[in-house]
Amino acid sequence: RQYSMETLTGSPATIDEIFKLFKEENAGLIYPDHNDEIPLIAYSWLANEARGRQMFREYDIDAPFPSVFNYPAGSFFWARTEALKPIFDKYYSLDDFEVEAGQTDGTLAHALERILPFICEKQGFEQFILSPMEEQKVKQHKSTLAFKEYFKLDKQALIMELSQYEIISFDIFDTLFTRSVVDPDDVFDLMSEAIYKKYNKKVDFKTLRKKAEAEAVEENEAFTNISHIYGKLSKDKTIGEFATALKDMEIDLEYKLCQPRKDMVEVYSALKSMGKTVILTSDMYLSKPHIAAMLHKCHVSYYDDLILSCEVGARKDDGSIWELIFEHYPKEYFVHVGDNFRSDSQILMDNGVKSFTVLSPKALLELSDFSYLLDYTMDSRFTRSMRVANSLMLGHALN
């Protein structure tokens, strides 16, 4: 709080500079840069993702939904009223907010502070980030200060860090290997294209597939696998008769699209060669044989355990899978490595378990100066075929 207040109101010169940004630079939102007391993972949605997606829809924000981003962490900021007018127009009342009970995440307030920059830019204003200790003291739109130490860490340093532990757990997707598309849902758009070519059926497969998965999860919960999902799709009047063939098509496509994150596979292999116990875990609807084949293709082998949500009926994203894992692997000798800030890091940190966050290829792109390329994979001005093609090209370049 002291850092934030000093950054925003510390001197007359500071306030003059802030008002100059409002007057001359079309500033709508001005807030402090990262402070060392805030963990790196805070610059993501964490437990607020579902609410964040809902707010993107409510406020009609057509920007890509990010995995990492800047926002006024701690809710200290200057703002132009017009820049945040859509929030004022919501007329939130005290009753809309959860009762304060020491929550550190997952409340309306936590979601609101994260949505501010996106509303500001939708309103046609700029966001500025103040970094009083940096050479560049005023940054527009983006800062990577929170990730400075992460970017210093090389492969050998990570191996040394992880080798302190006897049991190393790895997430699979976007950690050890990744799909050669920008977003996992792009696989379903590729399926739409394949269905049209093979069956001459024009369908929005992504919508159908996600609806089927939601219905399957409602019935089968964490045990949901790809057969459950396609069991739901088999009832669709347009593509139901092809459901079995489409299931095989999706499995085959996932296999073809997967490619290793070479540095991370080398980290994995180095730890395995040291005799460490290495387990792999994922929230996934594909079965063990399918995942094992993908791991083999990506040169990941000799793991000690492969734990999948659909096989054990427990998930990382609600913490239940960790309870099962720690029945067999003592947490005091344990570290987990993964890309998801919530399920691979925050949940473990809250339970006193060590974790290490690896940024996904998409997150790295979002932090770069080339994040605008993501627009080419979702802009409605492009046809679906063009967006899919752009996703494939960008996915290959990223990975």
Task: Describe the role of every protein-language-model region.
Residues 74, 108-150, 234, 346, ...:
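C-terminal accessory extensions appended to soluble enzyme cores
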Residues 339-355:
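Acidic, divalent-metal-coordinating active-site segment for phosphoryl/phosphodiester hydrolysis
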Residues 317-344:
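Conserved Lys-Pro-Asp/Glu-containing loop-to-beta segment of HAD-superfamily phosphomonoesterases
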Residues 159-208:
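Active-site neighborhood of HAD-like aspartate-dependent phosphohydrolases
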Residues 1, 31, 36-43, 73, ...:
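Short catalytic/ligand-binding loop motif for oxyanion handling, primarily in non-cytosolic enzymes
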Residues 191-194, 198-249:
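A metal-dependent, Asp-based hydrolase signature
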Residues 1-150:
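ER/Golgi luminal nucleotide-sugar-dependent glycosyltransferases, focusing on the catalytic module
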Residues 243-296, 305-309:
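Substrate-recognition element of Asp-dependent hydrolases with the DxDx(T/V) motif
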